[in-house]
């Protein structure tokens, strides 16, 4: 898990902090069990439903996004910090849904290792 925390994205944590997190998450059975317990609580208290919330909000914003992108024709352009331009609102929502799903699955696998 420490590897996931510090290697999946850049981290400013010191090497000592990285070693401590790795030791706790990989070598301490009680900490590992507690981490799994916290993760399961998080999943059961709404995280599993995050893509449903995304879809509900995407639907709620349908008319607004339509007017917005008629006025600002930027769906096919990289703007500010966008890593990509997918060309449609539905494609952008699908990208976020896929990201959330894969991130939850990957973290779940790492926590339960």
Each predicted region: which residue ranges?
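Middle-to-C-terminal accessory/interaction subdomains
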Residues: 1-113
């Amino acid at each position: 898990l420490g590897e996931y925390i510090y290697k999946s994205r850049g981290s400013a944590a010191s090497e000592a902090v990285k070693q401590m997190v790795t030791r706790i998450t990989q070598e301490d059975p009680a900490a590992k069990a507690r981490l799994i317990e916290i993760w399961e609580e998080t999943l059961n208290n709404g995280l599993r439903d995050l893509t449903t919330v995304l879809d509900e909000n995407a639907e709620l914003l349908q008319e607004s996004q339509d007017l917005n992108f008629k006025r600002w024709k930027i769906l096919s352009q990289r703007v500010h910090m966008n890593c990509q331009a997918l060309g449609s609102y539905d494609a952008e929502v699908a990208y976020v849904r896929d990201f959330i799903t894969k991130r939850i699955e990957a973290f779940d696998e790492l926590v339960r290792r």
